[in-house]
């Protein structure tokens, strides 16, 4: 029952995040955004959801129908699975595990398979290229994210996300890891395929990327999975570096989408492999030694 309540809460959070995104982007672009459905457009996400659910699901003739239907659901299911170990409030968590951070990393790695299946099962060149782009991007930045988490875990001496959040209430760990928080946010943008790293969904090149052939309920699950991942990774970054919940990270996701242009694919991979990865390896070696010598931690 608790898991069902959390799942419904995440769906509602996704609904209102899309509304906030459209409102904020409208404000940045000097327009109103949704303002007709309900008071100030507050019912717009529900109208969009009902519209998508009532539409007909079109199955491409040459598609692998089983994978085509199941892959979007797998994407959303994996996004929800993380919330088993993420603390919902102080002392409130569905499953308090000592290895909760490790479980989150494992689940995020499995998300690559859902995207591969989504793109391959449609038997379309656009969906396949979009899924391959997304896979290469996620694998590249998954390494950076893993090293980032390793550094934080090394400093906090725990793999329990709840304990790490309490530990971050102190200022020493927080300020010493401030550069890592910036890199973590960049890696989070790439992990969730958000601007300026939204190459898997580049409309001018790949129509809608790996979601091109999906419609109705299958598109709804892909959409829910994408935005649920944004909420999940924003929450994890908050707990790892700030020690509390702050909507600022989600606001930055939206603000950057409205302001920054899309990178080229070679620029994206170069940033991950030639800049972020060496910096993280160097930081992993230097930071603990520096704090030990200065007797700060």
UniProtKB/Swiss-Prot annotation:
One Pfam entry for this protein is: NADHdh
Report any one BP term from Gene Ontology: aerobic respiration
Record's catalysed reaction(s)? a ubiquinone + NADH + 5 H(+)(in) = a ubiquinol + NAD(+) + 4 H(+)(out)
How would you classify this enzyme at the top EC level?
Answer: translocase
Q: How does it sit in the membrane?
A: Multi-pass membrane protein
Q: What superkingdom heads the lineage?
A: Eukaryota
Q: Name one GO molecular function term.
A: NADH dehydrogenase (ubiquinone) activity
Asked if Iron is a keyword of the record, the answer is no
Q: What is its main location?
A: mitochondrion
Disulfide bond entries = none
S-adenosyl-L-methionine is among the record's keywords: no
GO cellular component labels: mitochondrial inner membrane
Where in or outside the cell is it found? Answer: Mitochondrion inner membrane
Entry's InterPro entries?
NADH_UbQ_OxRdtase_su1/FPO, NADH_UbQ_OxRdtase_su1_CS
Keyword terms, alphabetized: Electron transport, Membrane, Mitochondrion, Mitochondrion inner membrane, NAD, Respiratory chain, Translocase, Transmembrane, Transmembrane helix, Transport, Ubiquinone
Q: What is its EC number?
A: 7.1.1.2
Segments spanning the bilayer are 1-21, 34-54, 66-86, 99-119, 139-159, 170-190, 206-228, 235-257, 277-297
**What functional role does this protein have?**
Core subunit of the mitochondrial membrane respiratory chain NADH dehydrogenase (Complex I) that is believed to belong to the minimal assembly required for catalysis. Complex I functions in the transfer of electrons from NADH to the respiratory chain. The immediate electron acceptor for the enzyme is believed to be ubiquinone.
Q: Which family does it belong to?
A: Belongs to the complex I subunit 1 family.
**Name of this protein:** NADH-ubiquinone oxidoreductase chain 1
Q: What does the record give as the organism's lineage?
A: Eukaryota, Fungi, Fungi incertae sedis, Chytridiomycota, Chytridiomycota incertae sedis
């Amino acid at each position: 029952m608790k898991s069902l309540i959390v799942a419904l809460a995440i769906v509602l959070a996704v609904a209102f995040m899309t509304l906030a995104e459209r409102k904020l982007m409208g404000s940045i672009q000097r327009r109103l955004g949704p303002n007709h459905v309900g008071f100030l457009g507050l019912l717009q996400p529900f109208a969009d959801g009902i519209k998508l659910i009532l539409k007909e699901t079109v199955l491409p003739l040459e598609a692998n129908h089983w994978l085509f239907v199941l892959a979007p659901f797998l994407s959303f299911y994996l996004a929800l699975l993380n919330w088993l170990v993420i603390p919902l409030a102080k002392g409130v968590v569905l499953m308090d595990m000592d290895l909760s951070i490790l479980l989150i990393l494992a689940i995020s790695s499995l998300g690559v398979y859902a995207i591969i299946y989504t793109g391959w099962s449609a038997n379309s060149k656009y969906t396949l290229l979009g899924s391959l782009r997304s896979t290469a991007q996620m694998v590249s930045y998954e390494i950076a994210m893993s090293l980032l988490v390793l550094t934080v875990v090394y400093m906090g001496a725990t793999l329990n996300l709840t304990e790490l959040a309490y530990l971050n209430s102190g200022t020493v760990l927080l300020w010493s890891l401030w550069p890592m928080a910036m890199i973590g946010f960049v890696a989070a943008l790439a992990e969730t395929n958000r601007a300026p790293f939204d190459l898997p969904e580049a409309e001018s090149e790949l129509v809608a990327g790996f979601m091109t052939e999906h419609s109705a309920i299958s598109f709804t699950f892909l959409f829910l999975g994408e935005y649920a991942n944004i909420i999940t990774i924003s929450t994890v970054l908050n707990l790892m570096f700030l020690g509390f919940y702050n909507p600022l990270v989600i606001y930055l996701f939206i603000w950057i989408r409205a302001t920054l242009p899309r990178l080229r694919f070679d620029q994206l991979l170069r940033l991950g492999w030639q800049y972020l990865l060496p910096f993280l390896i160097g930081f992993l070696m230097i930071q603990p030694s520096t704090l030990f010598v200065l007797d700060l931690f």
